[in-house]
Regions:
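A compositional/biophysical signature of low hydrophobicity enriched in polar/charged and small residues
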Residues: 1-184
Length: 184
């Protein structure tokens, strides 16, 4: 269900998010022109969306290969069998502490999930294969990760054949597409 249909976002709010996902570098005046609303409306709406947490950050998608990164890795992990609330909270605290102290900056996503028997995913970028193996080695320090049961998918960022380059523009268009009515 689209956010607008759920009554969470107004049409102009959803369209503004879509425009920002396509290009967050545009001025409020340019966004107002694209949305066919006034510049103060865009400014007020953008500030509201920031305050309410709909807009977390403004960023760019660089050419990672030109920045010296060779690999993108998607690592599926399994948690250890003991998954009590206490163990999961301890795991979360260890992860947050490690992220704050050692700042493994190559990790762009580390989250719980499900599918194929796996319970989490790590998405990261690496300048070399040895950088990637160093991250995998650090994972052994996490007592809640079953390191004997991980699955890695590596993407060569220098590969000339790309079926769809990394972009949010397609998702920006998708959030404006009406969803099919569910059968009752």
């Amino acid at each position: 269900m689209r956010a607008k249909e759920a009554g969470i976002l107004k049409d102009v709010e959803l369209r503004l998010i879509s425009e920002l996902m396509k290009n967050s570098r545009r001025s409020d005046r340019e966004l107002a022109r694209a949305l066919k609303v006034s510049q103060p409306t865009v400014t007020r709406t953008r500030c509201k969306l920031e305050k309410e947490g709909y807009l977390k950050e403004y960023t760019v998608i660089p050419d990672f290969a030109k920045l010296g990164f060779q690999l993108a890795s998607f690592i599926l992990i399994k948690g250890t069998k003991s998954r009590s609330a206490e163990v999961m909270e301890k795991a979360r605290q260890i992860t947050l502490k490690d992220m704050a102290e050692r700042a493994p900056n190559e990790i762009v996503l580390f989250n719980r999930g499900m599918g194929g028997g796996y319970t989490g995913v790590i998405v990261s970028f690496h300048k070399s294969y040895s950088d990637y193996t160093e991250l995998v080695g650090r994972m052994k320090q996490y007592p809640f990760v079953d390191t004997s049961a991980t699955l890695s998918f590596l993407v060569d960022l220098n590969d000339r054949i790309q079926y769809r380059p990394f972009t949010f523009s397609t998702l920006a268009k998708h959030i404006l597409t009406p969803q099919k009515q569910e059968k009752k």
